[in-house]
């Protein structure tokens, strides 16, 4: 190898090393700072004393508990759980950014669990915005198939599977949503369909984006990602939860669908949901 050619290769290697270093640095800055600019919400408004006669909006602003959860807790004679939720809503545990796929994809997790899940029914939708990739806070979604079990397509390289629902309280923020004005039987049908058809399906990031948005589940290329799993289960019964109608279904799309109501939120600003309802 001539001296000139050797110098040329040295420059190429040096450029590759510099680009790699810049990529790693950019990813670190995005994941460490940009992704956390709108992380866990802590109320910036006054805490008030709650009573069993407080209106739904006040309880929601103070605890993150929606009407379905409040009704259930009051019917169970468990007003103390509402007060406990208020404590954690205003004084959340410390969060930590942890690795899901190295520094590429990370999750913001609480050091100790947040409020317990007040009311989970089959078919309920669970969402967190704690998951972020290269600074993009895309979140994660799952569907309840039992009061204590969720069906999720959790991570690239793994098939959809069932997980303990209570693990959602480890996230720095989460939401429980339910189809509006529908009987429990509807949610049960969606949950049953998920278990019979969408369990053990490969993770495909481009699901619904390339090819038909809702292909036959028997198609050879059929796959899921977290939000698409939820959307696909509900579209089978005629409910399109994709709020922006695009090809890519995201956790944000599900969270802001007009077809769902809030059962419970934590680490999210309740005012955005009251504004949407208004």
Question: Each predicted region: which residue ranges?
Answer:
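Active-site nucleophile-His-acid catalytic modules used for acyl/amide transfer and hydrolysis
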Residues: 175-245
